[in-house]
Amino acid sequence: TVTVTIPSSTIPGNYILISRANSNNVVVESNTTNNLGFSLLNVFTPPITDLTVANVMIPDTVMLGYTMDTARWVIANLSAEEARGYTSDGIYLSAGNLFDSTATLIGIKNKNINLQPLRTDTVKLAPLVTGVVEGNYSVFVKTDLLNQLSESDKDNNTGISATPVYVKVKELPLNVNELNTLHTISRYYKLRIPDSLYGSTILVTLKSNDSLTMKNEMFIAGGYVPTPANYDYGYEIPNYGNQQIVMSDVTDSVYYIMVRCVSPNPLVQNITLKAVKLPFAILNVHTNSGGNIGNVTVRIRGSLYRDSMVAKLSNGTTTIYASAVYFTNSTQVFATFPLQGRPLGVY
């Protein structure tokens, strides 16, 4: 059985409904000329109804990146005709009390409706809350979102919650391991920076129990919720499960963190997030080898670097000073070491 929706723009009249078996030719057949079926179909204009939305009921708080538990609203048929067909209700978050272009669509409830005259029906949905910042929001519900039903009045299709919902972001405390799971839904966190740490360097790490096969990404923004297209700091290593971000000279009181998995058909991961204040430190070195027939330039990532810093290699008996140190910022420098004729070994 296949259910199809006849477009509302279809002109009433008599039609032939054509169906075809094995339409994508996946099954090998000896004869494909008998795969078509035909049926006469009469399309008529449905009676005009009038739907309204009332009693939008919502929780008082919801976490960003989690589902709302649970939104409910009442659809009423104010007409003398039966409202019948396939329709969609949309649920929106609005920072004000107006339903306009600034409202964010967070969920759509698709349903078959068969509502008798002057009757009501309660609809519920647990939408995923994304695309907004922290704060209070009015919740709007618009019925027949795609204009699939004929109605006498489309201006009364929207209802608003009596009280707002507060969208919160889960907090990531400094120096605390935050355990969570990561699958197909992005996770969001809020990192508070006290006044005493303004100007510091903060390291945020993401560790996965499946770092070699999963592909994770992390984005951070100061004062607003980041997206993959809009952020202040981004992950370092593509196609890898573990990620880290070094934020130098932090100046915002709140940073928002977005973590997502971009692997196709991913498994549920156990992840650990942690944010720490970095002292002067070397986090990693690229490249980590070089021949003793000339110069080698390496990238050194870390924290609290200065333009006047010195870099050297040492193995306990031999010290090799960098001939040049190229300062990029307080988290990265490039150092060139003259290795011509130097003893082999680990430094």
What annotation goes with each model-predicted range?
Residues T1-S196, S211, D252-V254, V262-K277, ...:
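Extracellular/luminal regions of secreted and cell-surface proteins that mediate adhesion/ECM remodeling
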Residues I75-A76, L93, G294-R306:
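A short glycine/threonine-centered beta-strand motif
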Residues S88-Y92, F140, T205, E217-A221, ...:
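Beta-strand signatures of extracellular beta-sandwich domains
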Residues N110, F219-T272, S330-V346:
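Noncatalytic accessory or regulatory domains flanking protease catalytic cores in secreted, cell-surface
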Residues V141, G290, V296-R301, A311, ...:
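A structural motif
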Residues L197, D210-M214, S303-S308:
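Short proline/glycine-enriched turn/loop motifs at strand-loop junctions of beta-rich domains
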Residues S200-N209:
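A short beta-strand element within beta-rich, extracytoplasmic domains
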Residues G302-Y305, L313-I320:
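Ser/Thr/Gly-rich low-complexity blocks that favor extended beta-strand/coil architectures
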